[in-house]
Amino acid sequence: MSERQPIRRALVSVYDKSGLDQLAKALIDAQVEVVSTGSTAKELASHGVTVTEVSEITGFPECLDGRVKTLHPKVHAGILADRRLTSHREQLTALEVKPFDLVVCNLYPFAETVAQGGDFDECIEKIDIGGPSMVRAAAKNHANVAVLTNPDQYEDLARALSEGGYTMEERRVLAARAFAHTAAYDVAVATWFGSRDGVAVDGVPTFVGTTGELSHPLRYGENSHQAAAVYRSSGEPGLAGARQLHGKAMSYNNYVDTNSARRAAFDFEAPCVAVIKHSNPCGIATGSDIAEAHRKAHACDSLSAFGGVIATNRPVSVEMAEQVAEIFTEVVVAPGYEDGAVEILSRKKNIRLLECPAPHLAGWELRQIDGGLLAMETDLFQADGDDPANWTLAAGDPVDDVTLADLSFAWRACRSVRSNAILLAHDGASVGVGMGQVNRVDSCRLAVERAGDRAAGSVAASDAFFPFADGPQVLIDAHIAAIVEPGGSIRDDQTIEVCRTAGVPLYFTGTRHFFH
């Protein structure tokens, strides 16, 4: 390992002041000269650090409500000077600039301000200028300067100081993290700015981007010959930061299915369980409690549920845990677990138990294509047609409240099924799912086949319109009680006619929920 770079002088300017007591102790113990700014200097001084204010170095006061603090040649020359070069050392001497060996800086909470609903001016004020400049300068000059951007690095700083400083390899790792930090920050600003009124074009952002920091490598990807890893985005921890309570390490496919399952379960306000396999529902159900919801979801297709992923929108109860313990399950993900539930589930050595709060779905979804990205607003049931009060009765008589509730359930559950999607439901539970077929009539046949005798009296939802009347006829022949679909086909009159003739109520939503 390369020779260590001693740390004799540090520049510290942080917004997030957590861990400053730990940082202060490390700097004091190593007798590091500290230069700092404003409130950071005061906080460090309160922990016993002898601090030199930046304004004493620059001869220029902080100004413009703190907008200008460190943007000065005597600061940046001290960060950027490559002391391996004689000419740089000579210029530092001539300019009376002392170099920095360490820069500790984290940035204004821009993304957090946006997430909290800050107005335009508040968000603008939280765009950091001096901080990213210092961080990038130190990262560029990592041959001479170490840079820290997160309080979680302070403990390792104490270790490095005790060993005589960071090695070149360690400084390079710190620099990479620093550049990732500023890159994510800039992407957040550009994405927000690109969606503002007067900047967006026809309501579409002029810039979209996403960043990810390596969380951990995975054993392999979708298949064993593909490398894979999990990357965490800034903000809410989400599934990528879920707490694993038990079981083997998550696989790539586990993550994909778990992500689909969580979204399906949290599409409902009532206690809900979604059982997912290959990103498609084996069953989705609501119940009076989470154990009942699980029984109903599992009953939809107990054969396919073998080796599936289970997601809940409520903590897993002991009763539900006892039920799941009898089934081979890859993953259970929930916002929590009642006392005793984890112990029951842990009887199965390999089952993966994750604790994760409700998903925070981004306003826009991105999908990579050759040469670019596709971006669209996330489907959050925000359309008028997702409210049954706005549905149009196209055929038959109005249904009673119980049947309407089942139609509403089926409509929401159907969104989680890969297109072409048909979902049959009864009593707040799916009883037959037809997914992923390239024609809609085959999806109808598959849903009816999966439901068996349960098809009679159930209701049906279709994620898109019926192009022909053959699909509805399959459902009618299975004695479906009512159908809900978007409508909009040039042959809607044929679908309306077969439903009218059979006396089957048909509702049009005017909204589609394709899912590819």
UniProtKB/Swiss-Prot annotation:
EC number: 2.1.2.3, 3.5.4.10
SUPFAM superfamilies named in the record: Cytidine deaminase-like (SSF53927), Methylglyoxal synthase-like (SSF52335)
Keyword Transmembrane helix on entry: no
Pathways per UniProt: Purine metabolism; IMP biosynthesis via de novo pathway; 5-formamido-1-(5-phospho-D-ribosyl)imidazole-4-carboxamide from 5-amino-1-(5-phospho-D-ribosyl)imidazole-4-carboxamide (10-formyl THF route): step 1/1; Purine metabolism; IMP biosynthesis via de novo pathway; IMP from 5-formamido-1-(5-phospho-D-ribosyl)imidazole-4-carboxamide: step 1/1
Domain of life according to the entry: Bacteria
Catalytic activity: (6R)-10-formyltetrahydrofolate + 5-amino-1-(5-phospho-beta-D-ribosyl)imidazole-4-carboxamide = 5-formamido-1-(5-phospho-D-ribosyl)imidazole-4-carboxamide + (6S)-5,6,7,8-tetrahydrofolate; IMP + H2O = 5-formamido-1-(5-phospho-D-ribosyl)imidazole-4-carboxamide
Record flagged with keyword Hydrolase: yes
Domain annotation MGS-like: ranges: 1-149
Example GO BP: 'de novo' IMP biosynthetic process
GO cellular component, one term: cytosol
Pfam families the record matches: AICARFT_IMPCHas, MGS
Annotated Gene3D superfamilies: 3.40.140.20, Methylglyoxal synthase-like domain (3.40.50.1380)
Keywords carried by this UniProt record: Hydrolase, Multifunctional enzyme, Purine biosynthesis, Transferase
Cross-referenced PROSITE patterns: MGS (PS51855)
Domain remark from Swiss-Prot or TrEMBL: The IMP cyclohydrolase activity resides in the N-terminal region.
Name of the protein this chain belongs to: Bifunctional purine biosynthesis protein PurH
Organism annotation: Cutibacterium acnes (strain DSM 16379 / KPA171202) (Propionibacterium acnes)
Gene: purH
